[in-house]
């Protein structure tokens, strides 16, 4: 029987599709997104969703306009009885998941995915440092996309959480097809210029 997993993530982005699909294949997974598109970039969501092996769900807007304060996370966790929860970075949503673990299900495994490089980790704002400090005492693991960050975390932040390096992945076959499409577009673009 597959373990139950809930993923809370900001948005669907092209570089996360294969990662999410891999998770969906291995776990009995449910995916909840905070936004219908990435805040810093705009992607063709309709097209991206064609590549997903799951149906995405979306969280209600942040409480009092605070983007990461989404109390429906607590009811989702209560109803779904997950074994593992994936969150993104260190934020209020992640703190709510940690609070749920402390108050309701101490055996819940919480894993965060962090894209910080070493400079970002070292120069984090005091708010992020406090959240990171609190959460690293509760999290089961931190997945870091940069090997140097993992090394820095291991030597500078010795807390309960385990650190592991896992690069942003894409299926090789899909990547090669997209590269081929992009190359033909570049050729067409260069001829027009």
Predicted feature residues:
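A short, charged, and often flexible helix/loop element on the N-terminal side
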Residues: 50-72, 87-89
């Amino acid at each position: 029987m597959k373990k139950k997993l809930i993923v809370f993530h900001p948005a669907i982005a092209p570089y996360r599709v294969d990662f999410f699909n891999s998770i969906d294949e291995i776990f009995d997974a449910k995916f909840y997104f905070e936004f219908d598109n990435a805040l810093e970039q705009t992607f063709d969501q309709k097209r991206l969703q064609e590549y997903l092996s799951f149906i995405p769900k979306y969280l209600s807007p942040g409480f009092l306009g605070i983007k990461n304060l989404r109390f429906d996370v607590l009811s989702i966790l209560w109803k779904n009885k997950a074994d593992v929860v994936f969150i993104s970075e260190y934020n209020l949503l992640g703190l709510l998941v940690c609070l749920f673990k402390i108050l309701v299900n101490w055996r819940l495994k919480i894993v965060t995915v962090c894209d910080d490089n070493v400079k970002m980790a070292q120069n984090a704002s005091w708010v992020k440092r406090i959240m990171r400090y609190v959460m690293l005492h509760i999290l089961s693991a931190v997945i870091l996309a940069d090997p140097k960050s993992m090394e820095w975390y291991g030597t500078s932040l010795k807390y309960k959480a385990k650190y592991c390096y896992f690069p942003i992945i894409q299926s090789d076959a899909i990547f090669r097809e997209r590269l081929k499409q992009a190359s033909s577009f570049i050729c067409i673009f260069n001829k027009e210029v």
